[in-house]
Structures are given as structure tokens and as C-alpha cells.
Amino acid sequence: MRRNSPSIQLMHTYFFGGPITRTVKALIIVNIAVYVLQITAHLFGIQSIDWYFGLVPIRVTHELMLWQFVTYMFLHGGVIHIYINMLTLFMFGNELERFWGTRRFLSYYFITGIGAGICSWLVAINNSAVIIGASGAIYGLLLAYGMTYPNRIVYLNFLLPLKVKWMVLIMGGFAFLSSIAGSEPGVANIAHLGGMVVGYLFLKGNDWRDRYRQFNEHHRREQLKRQFEVYYGDVRRKVESDNKKGPTIH
């Protein structure tokens, strides 16, 4: 049996996020399968797959093609596009899924992806440009990783050591400035920024719900405590009153 050396195992665990998890693996397989179908359709001159399943704001607005908010996430604009997205999903998604659990991870992935699509639609309701790619969800994952492991070190371009929180701030700032400047034609920077904003609201919303739940639980315990004290006080006063009456002779 072939075994990896400890150094290789450590690199695999800490640099690449450890063994691939079930949901991350499934997402990568589905994305690659859809991309193969997409380029096969293009080879046969079928371009309607992008027009029908990509996010086309004007079609959502006037034809109510609401499924596009989900399906656009599985289409990509080229090998580099899908490679970067899937590599990022692999590197950062595994650890988040192990930490959160499958259900929360998958919910977060789709909520940030759909939220990014909605943001793109809102700023260009009557635009006929086709928006495709999982980048909104991927940027959401990067934000979540930065908030969960802010002081982890990553190597930017495999060379420059950088804390995750600074990497997320740089990428978020770049997406924000690009969305204002309208630079990089063909890149949906609003979707990138939208994925991060929706991800932040999702994570903070969970914090607020947890605090509200804790507050309610504390308030309920205090109410029960006061009710018990009142009941116990009544019982004690009754016992003291009965004792003052003296013994009952049968």
C-alpha cells in the first residue's frame, strides 16, 4: 500500500482544504458536466442554451424566466473561467462544509449565487446581456472563509503570504471599484460584489437569530424562575400559617 509522507499530507490538509467533501465534489462534477454539455451545444451551433439558461435580465423582467437565477450559476464562459471557480470552490469549500455541515453549506452556496444574480438583474433590468458563472457564489464562499478563519495564511499567486481577511477585503474592494468604474467588459463585477454582500447578510442574520434565540431563552427562564418563586412563596406562607394554628386532633 502506498502512503503519502507527513509533509505531503499536511500540505494536502492545510493548503488545499483537506479531502474533498461530498457536496463540493457533487458541485464540481455537475458544473463540469454542464460545461461539457454547453461547449458541445456550441460546437453544433446551438447558442440558445446560454440565452435560455444563462441570466438574461430583460427575459427575467418581461418573460418571468425565474429559473435563470439558479441555472446561470452552472454555465461558464471558458475553460479558465470554470477552472478558477472550481479550484476556489475546492480550496475553500471543503473546510466550510466540514465546519457548517452539508445542509447549511449548500443553502449558503445557492443563496449567495441566487442573491448575486438578483443584484445583477436589479442594476440592469432591461439589459439583454447574458450573465453566466458561479462567481457570485464563489465570492460568497471567500467572504465566509474570511469571516470564519480571518487569520489563516494563504499564498496569493502561490507566492505572497497573506491573511485571508486581507485577501477578502482586497477582492471585495476590487469588485466594488470595478462595478463603479464599469471596467473589465464581460465580467459581472456586480455579481461578485452581490455574492459577498448577500453572504455577509446571511452570516450576520444567523448571528442575529442566534442572539434573539438566546435572548428569548433567557427571558423564558427568567419568567419560569419568577413563577416558581411566586409559587414557592405562596406554599411557604401557607405552611407557616398552618404551623401557627397548631396540631389538628383526630
Stretches found by the model and what they are:
Residues 1-20, 175-250:
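C-terminal transmembrane module of polytopic alpha-helical membrane proteins
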Residues 14-132, 177-203:
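N-terminal TM1-TM2 helical hairpin plus the immediately adjacent luminal interfacial "cap"
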Residues 79-93, 166-176, 225-234, 238:
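Alpha-helical membrane-embedding segments
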Residues 98, 148-161, 208-213:
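Alpha-helical transmembrane bundle and helix-membrane interface signal
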Residues 103-111, 132-137, 158-168:
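Cytoplasmic-side transmembrane-helix entry/capping segments in multi-pass membrane proteins
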Residues 113-117, 140, 144, 161:
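Small-residue faces within membrane-embedded alpha-helices
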Residues 129-150, 164, 191:
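Membrane-interface micro-motifs in multi-pass membrane enzymes
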Residues 142-143, 155-156, 171:
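Generic transmembrane alpha-helix signature in multi-pass membrane proteins
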